[in-house]
């Protein structure tokens, strides 16, 4: 990774005053997150922001934007030069909001003072729809655990219903699943080189919506056609079969491209990247994180930070997984 020459401050900017202080007249990428901004390598938004910064891009973060007012948080940096990035946060928003008994939780570990209500249900959908309404011509890339787990048809426990890919609901241009450093940097380079977002179709570890006619007619060595969303809706065994295929292909070094038709469209899920090398993951952890919450929180307690403040990252992903 090449370190950015414009690194002049400790935290990535989250306010217009900070970008003005840096002398920026534009921002390359604006990242929206359902979590408070903690500049630590255990927080996905911080990692993606720092990795993009290390590649020379100007990155701003909008943590926990207000989606219920005049949408000023979504407008404060204006239109980025490359794209918007959206993540619900380090935890699935519905797990964050509700107990297993579907009762509303009273706190949020990723919010200052543990306050509940700083993010909506399904922020991936809510934030992306707002951005698409304000900036219809600007690409929106979604990622994080909420988007990753919903990249294909999935059972939503809280709605007690089978739902199609979250891409069909949020209308994002690309979904990045799993560890996102490699795909997000590749996407940034392609957009910067002049490639249209609609032409970015084959980046590993991404999912996109294509026309139904683009779906292959039969399986081969590199493509696997899943049961359609409609078939899964009518037969839960079909959904179980899909789940098995998705898990198998997600754990292969050279998996197949997955295809699933839904609502007269087709979801294309490109295979995983090979695991990060020791050098790559060390480079990611060695970026200039402050390992602190942003000063705007004025020392307010963020429970998730209290848990990891003295920790050292040993791995990526869920240790139990």
Predicted regions and their residues:
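Catalytic cores of nucleic-acid editing and processing enzymes
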Residues: 1-5, 9, 32, 70, ...
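Acidic/glycine-enriched edge-of-secondary-structure segments
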Residues: 1-6, 55-58, 109-120
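N-terminal [4Fe-4S]-dependent radical SAM core
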Residues: 2-26, 36, 244-314
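Glycine-rich beta-alpha loop elements in corrinoid/cobalamin-binding modules
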Residues: 36, 44, 63-264, 269-273
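Short strand->helix junction
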Residues: 37-38, 319
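Short helix-loop-beta junction
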Residues: 47-59
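Local cysteine-cluster metal-coordination motifs and their immediate loop/turn environment
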Residues: 313-321
